[in-house]
């Protein structure tokens, strides 16, 4: 069995059930009814089994957790409120608010301009800004260098900062272990906005280095054990380590934090790996390993963990294929796709329009980085069983759109209203 499917991470997270003022176009009466019923029946979030929408010839299984998380709803509320509160002003986003094309397009339609693209390429120069402009910091956060540029212009960044509180929790934990002289290892994609922001803060407080995956973690571990030559480190990890990084000195004590949208199980595996490296190198045991390894498992994002655990539960159901809905550049959504792909055919789409007909679907291939067309995706049998989930930046309305599109092919869309009553 593939490693991802062996061991979901089961943690308990306490979260406030705040109600956010999110545009109604992103809401779904059906999905809201399903989620509310499941929430009432499973207040401790112990049950990760899916919800069945039985249309007769079509059976749709919805993941226990999916869609907008706390951080995303918080960011959307602040962004749209900022627009309403600043009529006539120029409003900018540092980059995409979240990795969802519909939400970003809606903000642009309201006049918001992006200063950078997802990868940090400048679209509008900072020099063109004035202190009278409004700049919104996205949910991923931003680097200290960019914050300083905005302050120098006179722009009040705290007022329009939508950084996810769970991302800030990672930053705070990095600072805490840095004060105890641990080097911060960031598990994340080096070009992702959140990883750049986290690395920026970690590197200010302590030596820091980024690892993209377990393969890179193993290589870094070999520098700790002395199996790799120190001089090779600087080319192997070019652009991924802090200024003045000294391999032999700075890898004696380490702690691992992550880009919150990475697979929780992958981050835990990487942390466990470095823990074992330290135990072996310094002759430690569980009671003494904290001299060289900081336990940071409390920084794992609850929403990422819930959505991923829900996919493990979803995959316990035998089905014909899975559909994952979300932005193609969304890291957390991509990981859900990867989990599903290991078990059954999976179609990654960003809205219902990608389902062209009962015989044809346009979907994104993560590996080839392009959209592909697949014919005959609906099997000629009944009932057709489909697993459905979505990323943390995907509006529930898009998922309902997919449900209605599929149900329409089986003359079953009329049952959607009945499901709302059933789950209400």
Provide a role label for each language-model segment.
Residues 5-424:
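The feature marks the mature, well-folded catalytic cores of soluble enzymes
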